[in-house]
């Protein structure tokens, strides 16, 4: 399977890859997103093209029911990244105005962060943090780590 949530533009092709030593039986829960139930053998991959209709599509596995993934189809999506364990991430973008957004379990969380990407320098650091949820207690490090590792920041033209 893939990360918990991915945000893509309409028509984007996604590959579901099985890196486990056993098969998975993947399906999309609404049955309306163009993916019929099928066995994904170990080492195999299957392509899926995101619908043209924006929305959230949930994928499950009959073999391992606890596996869940969401594909959010968003027309403004430009890039998707996953943060490291420290919550840091990087990506290459053309100069322009963008909006940074975090997602968790297929839903947008926190506040959008407007960002202006300029021609130079090569690396531009954000000065404002992406607020993706309520502040955690300082002594609650385990929960905070788990929370941030599941967030998926998404860049979109805005």
Residue ranges and their predicted role:
Residues 1-147, 151, 155-158:
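Extracytoplasmic copper-binding redox domains, predominantly the cupredoxin/blue-copper superfamily
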């Amino acid at each position: 399977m893939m990360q918990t949530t991915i945000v893509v533009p309409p028509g984007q092709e996604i590959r579901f890859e099985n890196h486990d030593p056993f098969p998975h039986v993947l399906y999309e829960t609404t049955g309306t997103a163009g993916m019929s139930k099928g066995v994904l053998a170990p080492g195999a991959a299957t392509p899926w093209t995101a619908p043209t209709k924006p929305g959230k599509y949930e994928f499950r596995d009959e073999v391992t029911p606890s596996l869940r993934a969401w594909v959010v189809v968003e027309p403004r999506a430009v890039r998707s990244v996953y943060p490291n364990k420290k919550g840091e991430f990087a990506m290459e973008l053309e100069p322009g105005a963008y909006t940074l957004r975090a997602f968790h379990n297929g839903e947008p969380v926190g506040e959008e962060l407007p960002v202006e990407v300029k021609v130079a320098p090569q690396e531009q650091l954000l000065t404002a943090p992406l607020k993706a949820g309520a502040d955690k207690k300082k002594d609650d490090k385990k929960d905070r780590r788990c929370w941030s590792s599941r967030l998926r920041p998404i860049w979109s033209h805005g």
